[in-house]
A protein has these predicted regions:
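Flexible, low-complexity charged segments
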Residues: 1-144
Length: 144
């Protein structure tokens, strides 16, 4: 009888130690900024060669936010990010001159970073990442 009580107490003590708030807080600290980003809906950007529209490239973009940013408020601004990207892509296409199936990612990142900082305010944007690019058609660059 005493053995049962002692073993039940030992099991209860072991379970209570693993479910403490301190252990849960350690797990949260390991993850860091979980969910501190805004994923943009896919955007079709034009590819222009010799003044003619030859293709579209669908781009998936993620805007990474700082830990001080209000994520829910900035996720509501996702249409503004897409609008800025589409306007910039039509003003001066981001296509790579060597490959008509790719976008010049560094130029897109620089442009969207600048526009996103204007949309959100200073100190809210950590980085912009192009997750993937999918061309509508596979094309080869025209001979020079």
């Amino acid at each position: 009888m005493n053995r049962r009580i002692i073993s039940a107490a030992a099991v209860g003590l072991a379970l209570s130690v693993t479910n403490t708030p301190v252990a849960a807080a350690d797990k949260v600290e390991e993850k860091g900024d979980v969910g501190q980003y805004v994923d943009l809906q896919p955007v079709g950007l034009p590819v222009v060669s010799n003044g003619r529209l030859v293709n579209y490239v669908f781009v998936y973009v993620r805007v990474n936010l700082t830990s001080a940013a209000n994520v829910s408020r900035l996720r509501e601004k996702e249409p503004f990010f897409r609008d800025a990207l589409v306007r910039a892509g039509h003003r001066m296409p981001f296509n790579s001159p060597s490959d008509l199936g790719k976008i010049d990612a560094p130029r897109l990142i620089a442009t969207l970073s600048r526009d996103a900082a204007i949309i959100t305010g200073p100190g809210q944007i950590r980085s912009v990442v192009v997750i993937s690019q999918t061309p509508r058609r596979r094309l080869v660059a025209p001979p020079a």
